[in-house]
């Protein structure tokens, strides 16, 4: 199977890794010069990966069923396990916010890009 992913942001990179893990040939098309660029600005440059105190009462959108299903399928523990499997060390603040131990969003982008490269995901930029 061949998979084309439009956009090399967090979702695009995660989707590419998931599809590649299932054996698909994957190509990411990103209009920026490199993937993950917007991730560098998240969490004031620290990249808040998740929150250990995440509950549905914190969700204020219109489709609560979708959010609940998504959170159950890929909860905080699974998110942290995923990033740990890529070699990212995280830290949890008293508020429950989870950040890379480096406190740099670039660390998250680097482990994702390295995983894409190691798994043979084709990336076309600009």
Regions picked out by a protein language model, each given a short descriptive name:
Residues 28, 48-50, 100, 122:
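Short, conserved beta-strand segments within well-ordered enzyme catalytic domains
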Residues 42:
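Extended acidic/charged loop-beta regions that coordinate divalent cations
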Residues 2-3, 16, 65-69, 99:
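Short, contiguous strand/loop micro-motifs
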Residues 12-14, 35-38:
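Short N-terminal binding/cap micro-motifs at the start of the first secondary-structure element
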Residues 73-126:
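Feature captures the FAD/FMN-dependent oxidoreductase FAD-binding
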Residues 1-28:
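N-terminal Rossmann-like FAD-binding beta1-loop-alpha1 element of flavoenzymes
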Residues 46-92:
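Glycine-rich active-site loop/strand segments that organize a redox cofactor
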